[in-house]
Regions:
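Conserved core segment of the aminotransferase class I/II
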Residues: 1-5
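Flexible hinge/switch segments at interdomain interfaces of large molecular machines
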Residues: 14-15
Length: 136
């Protein structure tokens, strides 16, 4: 769509390929966006990581799907640069993190978003809070 709009309207927009979500529809689902922790380690890039396990989520307990995790990586300036998710409905949860990577949002700001309780999306909030040692 970006290429078509550029051609038709004379725009010069670019695509941020790091913000394109990756989804695998297996059981459990797997999804990610941005850089992976392995890439950061291999490149020697300084980063921070927050992690949250599905087994600690009330909604995961209610639906009987306790396996999985959400991992969020930031750079030294607290900008969200990547996320890896494994678990129930993580392909649906990825949108918020794709937005954060695409717009260069800070983890502290995204962590202020109120998430419904009980919901699987609370895991996103908790993983982000874990980056700052504020996980419940």
């Amino acid at each position: 769509m970006v290429a078509a709009a550029n051609a038709v309207k004379g725009n010069s927009e670019t695509v941020n390929y790091k913000a394109i979500p990756s989804c695998v529809y297996t059981e459990p689902e797997v999804s990610g966006v941005g850089v992976t922790e392995d890439e950061l380690k291999a490149n020697g890039t300084p980063y921070h990581v927050g992690r949250f396990e599905f087994r600690a989520l009330g909604k995961a307990k209610a639906i009987g799907k306790l396996q999985g995790f959400i991992k969020v990586m930031t750079d030294e300036d607290d900008t969200i640069i990547g996320a890896s998710l494994v678990g129930p409905h993580v392909t649906d949860l990825l949108t918020e993190l794709s937005l954060a990577v695409g717009l260069g949002l800070k983890a502290k700001d995204v962590g202020k978003v109120i998430h419904a309780h009980p919901s699987l999306s609370e895991g996103l909030m908790e993983a982000i809070h874990d980056i700052h040692g504020e996980c419940v």
